């Protein structure tokens, strides 16, 4: 779905972690409707894979200069199901899961939801390591950030 006046962008995201928790990285490829592309990445020295998956989408959406018609492609069912299904119930339950435990990564879920309200978003799950060029590139960016954080200083 494309809303009138909104630029189209396809976003491919991935997160990675060595150990869980451990050094982690995220990567995103943004493909704009006019043919332009942008790659962004980052990471943290002590994080989890799920935090990196969420951060990848957050940073990609935050990189957009205005409201867009977005297709987010993620290999994380945690991210896709969390934002499209679970978050409504979590909020109604005071950020508790169906088994009454505290929702993890609430800070990131709140920020992701805030950013989703700025755009028209279609969420797609893509199979990891299945040959999708842009998902593979996002994975490479994320893994590069992990490796950068694993280098032992001399």
Swiss-Prot record:
Transmembrane segments: none annotated. Disulfide bonds: none annotated. It catalyses: Endonucleolytic cleavage to 5'-phosphomonoester. Its EC number is 3.1.26.4. It holds the Pfam family RNase_H. Residues 5-147 form the RNase H type-1 domain. Mg(2+) 2 binds at residues 14, 139. This is Ribonuclease H. It comes from Anaplasma marginale (strain St. Maries).
């Amino acid at each position: 779905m494309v809303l009138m006046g909104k630029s189209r962008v396809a976003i491919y995201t991935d997160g990675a972690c060595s150990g869980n928790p451990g050094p982690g990285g995220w990567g995103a490829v943004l493909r704009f409707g006019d043919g332009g592309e942008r790659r962004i990445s980052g990471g943290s020295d002590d994080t989890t894979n799920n935090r990196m998956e969420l951060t990848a989408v957050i940073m990609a959406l935050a990189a957009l200069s205005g409201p867009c018609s977005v297709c987010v492609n993620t290999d994380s069912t945690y991210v896709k199901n969390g934002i499209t299904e679970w978050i409504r119930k979590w909020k109604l339950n005071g950020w508790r899961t169906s088994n009454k435990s505290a929702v993890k990564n609430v800070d990131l879920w709140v920020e992701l939801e805030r950013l989703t309200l700025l755009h028209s978003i279609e969420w797609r799950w893509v199979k990891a390591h299945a040959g999708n060029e842009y998902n593979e590139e996002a994975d490479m960016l994320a893994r590069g950030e992990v490796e950068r954080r694993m280098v032992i200083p001399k």
